[in-house]
Amino acid sequence: MGIIEFLLALAQDMALSAIPAVGFAMVFNVPHRALRWCALLGAIGHGSRMVMMTAGFNIEWSTFMASMLVGCIGIQWSRWYLAHPKVFTVAAVIPMFPGISAYTAMISAVKISHFGYSEPQMILLLSNFLKASSIVGALSIGLSIPGLWLYRKRPRV
């Protein structure tokens, strides 16, 4: 993949991830003045995850680092716009949730329940369930770490 194709794919990924970020921000009653920043932060988070995955990181570590980036930027923007960081960050990380692997794990569980136990279905269930759980854990931990670092009152040593 050449650099032009990569940049076009990155721009498409960022544009398409801004849409659900704005949608969920509207569901969460984010103020209208903050909607564009939620879209931008969702695009930055998903785009940075794509860049890291293209560089060779696996999806769990890429999601963890992208959610830490979203958390840091959200805290900075909350200071500038006098809003809570969750106004920007929660809707921005939702496009990174693992819908496909969670859905595949659920379908595998239904197939095991309906057709009976089979080893390939169980392997598919466990691998997708663990992948989805790891990504959700990476999102939640990565989103909370910047707040722990940046709002610390006591000295570190």
Swiss-Prot record:
**Does Cell inner membrane count among this protein's keywords?**
yes
Keywords noted in UniProt = Cell inner membrane, Cell membrane, Membrane, Transmembrane, Transmembrane helix, Transport
Q: Which GO terms describe its biological process?
A: succinate transport
Q: Which Pfam families match?
A: ThrE_2
Its transmembrane ranges are 8-28, 55-75, 87-107, 129-149
* Membrane topology qualifier: Multi-pass membrane protein
Keyword DNA-binding tagged: no
Q: According to its UniProt record, where is this protein located?
A: Cell inner membrane
One Gene Ontology term, aspect cellular component? plasma membrane
Summary of the function given for this chain in its UniProt record: Involved in succinate export with YjjP. Both proteins are required for export.
State the similarity comment. Answer: Belongs to the ThrE exporter (TC 2.A.79) family.
Assembly and interactions? The transporter is composed of YjjB and YjjP.
* NCBIfam families, sorted: PRK09917.1
What is the protein named? Probable succinate transporter subunit YjjB
- Species of provenance: Enterobacter sp. (strain 638)
